[in-house]
Amino acid sequence: MAERTACVERNTLETRIKVSVNLDGTGKTRFATGVPFFEHMLDQIARHGLIDLDIECQGDLHIDDHHTVEDVGITLGQAFARAIGDKKGIVRYGHSYVPLDEALSRVVVDFSGRPGLSMQVPYTRARVGSFDVDLFQEFFQGFVNHAQVTLHIDNLRGSNTHHQIETVFKAFGRALRMAVEPDPRMVGQTPSTKGCL
């Protein structure tokens, strides 16, 4: 099987970003975004998805974290789309439930070519440290739009906001791993009755 890797650069007046991914990696990471809690969550995607991630971003953090978080989502989505290619031979669908103490989240993803996000996370507070948790909606929307996936995220229970978010990102990584995994019974075939995705 060909290497499923990609490197994407995206430069705007708000951010300068470079993202490299290896879908068949071991969870190696290197991050330089200037947003530590965000990097902690990106690490969950890589470690639990066994996806190598290298992400650099110079953003307008003097304003706030919004553009950095959203634009990393966009660029990561573009990198996934490029790395996965025509989607032949993949499982396509992935899902995961992940607990952390009192918190439990479920994530379901479909590499359908149809971007859509349903995200239900009733955060118990607005910030973790200085990080605005609403920005994770922007991250996932950016990813969904540019990876061309359908993504359902549900935090089923939890009272600690850090735990709620961490279970979401761990489940997201595991769902991605399942969806992009090569299916030995679908070699060379598109996992759709339409014949294309």
From Swiss-Prot:
GO cellular component, one term: cytoplasm
Coarse class of the protein's main subcellular location: cytoplasm
Keyword Amino-acid biosynthesis: yes
Subcellular location as annotated: Cytoplasm
UniProt entry tagged with the keyword Cytoplasm: yes
Pathway: Amino-acid biosynthesis; L-histidine biosynthesis; L-histidine from 5-phospho-alpha-D-ribose 1-diphosphate: step 6/9
One protein family per Pfam: IGPD
InterPro entries on file: IGPD_sf, ImidazoleglycerolP_deHydtase, ImidazoleglycerP_deHydtase_CS, Ribosomal_Su5_D2-typ_SF
Catalytic activity: D-erythro-1-(imidazol-4-yl)glycerol 3-phosphate = 3-(imidazol-4-yl)-2-oxopropyl phosphate + H2O
Enzyme class: lyase
Its EC number(s): 4.2.1.19
Key words, A-Z: Amino-acid biosynthesis, Cytoplasm, Histidine biosynthesis, Lyase
Biological process, per Gene Ontology: L-histidine biosynthetic process
Single GO MF annotation: imidazoleglycerol-phosphate dehydratase activity
Disulfide bonds: none
Classification via HAMAP family: HisB
Family, per entry: Belongs to the imidazoleglycerol-phosphate dehydratase family.
NCBIfam families: PRK00951.1-1 (NF002106), PRK00951.1-5 (NF002109), PRK00951.2-1 (NF002111), PRK00951.2-4 (NF002114)
PANTHER family, alphabetized: IMIDAZOLEGLYCEROL-PHOSPHATE DEHYDRATASE, IMIDAZOLEGLYCEROL-PHOSPHATE DEHYDRATASE HIS7
UniProt protein name: Imidazoleglycerol-phosphate dehydratase
Gene name as annotated: hisB
